[in-house]
Amino acid sequence: MAYYRNPSDVTAMPAWQALTKHRQAMQDFSMREAFTDDPKRFSQFTLSSAGLFLDYSKNLITAETRDLLVALAGEVGLKDAIKAQYYGELVNSSEGRPALHTALRRPVGDKLKVNGVDVIPDVHRVLNQMTELVGRIHDGLWRGYTEKPITDVVNIGIGGSFLGPELVSEALVAYAHKGVRCHYLANIDGSEFHELSMKIRAETTLFIVSSKSFNTLETLKNAQAARAWYLAQGGSEVELHRHFIAVSSNNAAAVAFGIREENIFPMWDWVGGRYSLWSAIGLPIALAIGMSNFKELLSGAYTMDQHFQSAPFDQNMPVLLALLGVWYGNFWNAQSHAILPYDHYLRNITKHLQQLDMESNGKSVRQDGTPALTDTGPVIWGGVGANGQHAYHQLLHQGTQMIPADFIVPIVSFNPVADHHQWLYANCLSQSQALMMGKTRAEAEAELRDKGMSEEEVQKLAPHKVIPGNRPSNTLVVERISPRRLGALVAMYEHKVFVQSVIWGTNAFDQWGVELGKEMGKAVYQRLTGGTEEPADDASTQGLINYFRGRHRG
């Protein structure tokens, strides 16, 4: 059986053993010296595809490092795993399912069978259904209970039904369709619903309830709150169908809620939530930017899919990024990875990538049920630059941990103000440069002497001004954020995550830890509300329940 389904000991593979020795040889490697010694280093460690330009030259690597990492990808059978995932094999072993989010962006005419049925016609049927709905709303033909056109769309969903769509609709706000505003309601916190309700009017609002089961607790509670609010504002049960539609595989529950069957968009069990923005879950995206731009998003992702499948591993963007992550996580003991977008409209990409990466690769068990033999997924964190430079970048530069980083920056701003974007771009490049170069003790001392300080003051302050440098980063550059390029960018990270799961032997498409929390939450709720007097399984949880019950009013 293939390694990706029944993994052996990856640490015993020749390439892994060679990488272990190579890591020791790289202990004193200096990126500064590497750039000085090799004027062609930049050209050797850059590539472009699907509208993205990747500079990975500021990494603790040589050509030999890359060769060994690529050899590891070959030894774990990555090529076969990529093909298996793309053509619908059961790569999600714990749930016995394929993982076919890539099918959502495949063109008409392609064929892909799941359980003997070609799914591509269904994919495009749903796209046509979305096109019709989006057209009616944008043309003012979909009317609320007072016959006024829809002006606001509220997506009710959580996790993958929220993070991906929010990222894309906000990243592409420059492409927004005038006349329709999109909002997101995710958290089961009354304050979020309250704040939203102050911005919309029931008579001109359409709610999209996005839940595969139509039973996700947070989503269902928010949908019920929205329904009650709609009725309290003057809406009626008879006209409910004008204001609520659903994306779900549980038609019966959606119909019972009051949604007409023709206004229910399907979900398939071969698409995981965190990979679902390409499906009808992306309805708020299409409503925000228009269906033609949504299809451009799909097209960009498809272009990256083709690159991922066909490019040699040493020229394959997702594969190289994945291998670099393995290099730092498993051989340099890096525990986290920073995502640093230098673009205001990409401010939510870190949140989406947190779910994509950490929910996929936050695993300690391999596909066959045996314990993982290596560290697996890192903590993903970060935020928009240049704000981070005045917050956590200090830790990146002078902290004791190695934290690789991805800088993401466009060349062109949609909203140029004086020379702001030149400064933003300069800040992005200078941060990656500073991480790589650092500042030596000799440089720090010389700098202080040039300021006229006494030698005593120089020796006292110089240690604090030393920056270790040699901190790795990648820089991803796009000409400007467009639907096509954003689609390619998100798809690239999806593929990166999958590659790492193959190497570690884990399943990137389940999330049993999330399920446990849901189950326990129901039991705690029953104890909080007096539904059961049976004590919790531990004294801490029971003590906190008692504390709540003794003080909660309302």
Swiss-Prot record:
This protein's GO CC annotations: cytosol
Compartment(s) where it occurs, according to its Swiss-Prot or TrEMBL record: Cytoplasm
Pathway info: Carbohydrate biosynthesis; gluconeogenesis; Carbohydrate degradation; glycolysis; D-glyceraldehyde 3-phosphate and glycerone phosphate from D-glucose: step 2/4
Molecular function (Gene Ontology), one example: monosaccharide binding
The entry's keywords: Cytoplasm, Gluconeogenesis, Glycolysis, Isomerase
GO biological-process terms attached to the record: gluconeogenesis; glucose 6-phosphate metabolic process; glycolytic process
InterPro entries: G6P_Isomerase, G6P_Isomerase_C, Phosphoglucose_isomerase_CS, SIS_dom_sf, SIS_PGI_1, SIS_PGI_2
Record protein name field: Glucose-6-phosphate isomerase
